[in-house]
Amino acid sequence: MSGGRRLPEPPLLVITDRTMTERPLADVVEAAFKGGCRWLMLREKDLDATAREALAAEIMAVAKPYGAQVIINRDYAASADGIHLPQGCSVSEARRLVGPGGLIGVSAHSLNEARSAAEAGVDYVTLSPIFLTASKPGYGPTLGLDGLRQIADSIPTPIIALAGVDADNAAACLKAGAAGVAVMGGVMAAADPEAATAALIDRIKRVQTSRQPSG
């Protein structure tokens, strides 16, 4: 069963990778916030615990003026808004750490993994790889829009489409049943992260607007 906590709006999850950026990560993150991002995953798994904690504090300070939510991949920082888990981690233990209001997400690459995460009570599932991408190798064949649609139709938990998502296909992901989309390289490696973020959000909002009843 889904945790049921409301996801940030707009439903664009920007995932960090400082090895892709041409500027300090905090600068790229702030550019994404200026472009309209309100949901960020800090994913810097190569850093040791002390360095990750320091970077998390810096990024959360950048997020605060924008009202953006920051979740941490694998770890949890006391002032973060949630945690994102790989497969096999305890969702109940994560809930104990983040409290009743924190977001908990899990990575999935198949229907079975997505269903297990949903049954554990997570708030969202990142599903990948939807499309080919250099930043998510090694996870088998792409699911495509048909695979995304099948899995989104099979579980109640919001699905966040990940891998190869860009401004050209974000709308198609939402129309296939994704509750939102996630991007890494499309923002982290962009020459203009603010513009790249704004373009993605524009596509998302167009779909949202088209679903609103007229009159």
Regions inferred by a protein language model and the residue ranges of each:
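Short, solvent-exposed loop/turn segments at secondary-structure boundaries
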Residues: 136-140, 193
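Acidic/glycine-enriched connector segments
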Residues: 89-90
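A short acidic, helix-capping loop that chelates divalent metal ions and anchors anionic groups
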Residues: 42, 131-137
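Non-cysteine beta-strand/loop elements that form the S-adenosyl-L-methionine
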Residues: 86, 123-131
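Short, glycine-/small-residue-rich phosphate/pyrophosphate-handling segment
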Residues: 143-149
